């Protein structure tokens, strides 16, 4: 018997301690089932009400470093083809969960720490929608190195331009940029998920993900949204924690609109829209964050 709704996360073995803390944080505030997909590993996540599923997938070999270390935290190398081949499992995992475990799913990035509002994410789901509802991006236009930007009516320098050219998509219709770290999806979105993965798997993109998909599966999701002229989604519901702190966020407060406080850090419009703190990968630091959030209840 399927659940009405569930959370889904995924990881490889090296990343599993981070994802386990993410699942633990959700469980502090939610009794909704959690499914963790573990890529090419039998390791199990030890959190109550959480089921671990082995997910076998092909990982394209790439000898370049997968991660870069920054203090006690680390970040993925978006140039790395192995990382790309793991990230594009996201739509397939969401599809699998919808087909086998639940009528609706909420995908959550594994380097997230939930707040008491986490379950509100399911309130944004339209069960009749034929596409996932992705979270609003922190910025409307992204840059990477010397690439990116839209100048006047010239879209040819945008990060998404090569993929738009590849798939024949007119990006001038674009409105809000969407991020793929948080989304909700129902059964009627399975066709979208399949097309998303098919586009991500294009041989030219696999061979040169840096050119065509600089933000990996997220770049391609936006191209597909523009192709279908889909503009709705989740509001901005998280805070990047790397350059701020939980105490600072609550000290600044909520202004009724998305509030950019520094580069790559914004606070959602309302406190009830703050569902997750994002970006901390050190399990010890994540545990401290969980305890601080519990104390603030």
Feature map (PLM): residue ranges:
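A glycosyltransferase accessory/donor-loop signature
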Residues: 1-5, 9, 18, 163-180, ...
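Short, polar loop motifs at secondary-structure junctions
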Residues: 37-44, 116-118, 237-239
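GT-A fold catalytic core of metal-dependent nucleotide-sugar glycosyltransferases
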Residues: 86-145
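Charged, glycine/proline-rich intrinsically disordered loops and linkers
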Residues: 56-81, 142-170
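Short amphipathic alpha-helical segments and helix-helix/interface helices
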Residues: 20-27, 94-95, 119-123, 221-222
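A conditional alpha-helix N-cap/helix-loop micro-motif detector
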Residues: 15-16, 84-87, 214
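N-terminal anchoring/stem segment of glycosyltransferases
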Residues: 1-78, 99-102, 255, 281-286, ...
């Amino acid at each position: 018997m399927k659940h009405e709704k569930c959370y889904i996360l995924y990881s490889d073995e090296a990343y599993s301690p981070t994802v386990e803390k993410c699942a633990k944080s959700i469980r502090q505030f939610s009794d909704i089932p959690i499914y963790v997909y573990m890529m090419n590993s039998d390791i199990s996540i030890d959190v109550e009400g959480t089921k671990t599923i082995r997910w076998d997938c092909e990982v394209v070999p790439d000898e370049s470093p997968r991660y870069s270390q920054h203090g006690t935290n680390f970040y993925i190398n978006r140039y790395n083809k192995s990382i790309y081949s793991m990230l594009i499992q996201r739509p397939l995992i969401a599809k699998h969960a919808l087909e086998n475990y639940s009528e609706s799913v909420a995908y959550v990035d594994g380097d997230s720490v939930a707040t008491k509002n986490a379950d509100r994410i399911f309130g944004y789901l339209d069960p009749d929608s034929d596409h996932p509802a992705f979270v609003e991006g922190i910025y409307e236009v992204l840059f990477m190195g010397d690439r990116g930007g839209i100048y006047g009516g010239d879209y040819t320098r945008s990060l998404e331009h090569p993929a738009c050219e590849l798939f024949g998509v007119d990006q001038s219709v674009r409105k809000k940029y969407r991020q793929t770290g948080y989304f909700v999806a129902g059964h009627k979105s399975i066709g979208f998920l399949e097309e998303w993965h098919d586009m991500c798997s294009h041989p030219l993109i696999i061979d040169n993900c840096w050119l065509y998909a600089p933000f990996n599966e997220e770049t391609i999701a936006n191209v597909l949204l523009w192709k279908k002229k889909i503009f709705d989604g989740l509001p901005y519901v998280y805070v990047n924690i790397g350059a701020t702190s939980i105490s600072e966020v609550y000290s600044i407060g909520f202004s009724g609109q998305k509030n950019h406080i520094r580069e790559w850090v914004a606070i959602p419009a309302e406190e009830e829209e703050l569902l997750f703190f994002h970006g901390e990968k050190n399990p010890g630091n994540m545990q401290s964050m969980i305890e601080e959030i519990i104390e603030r209840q």
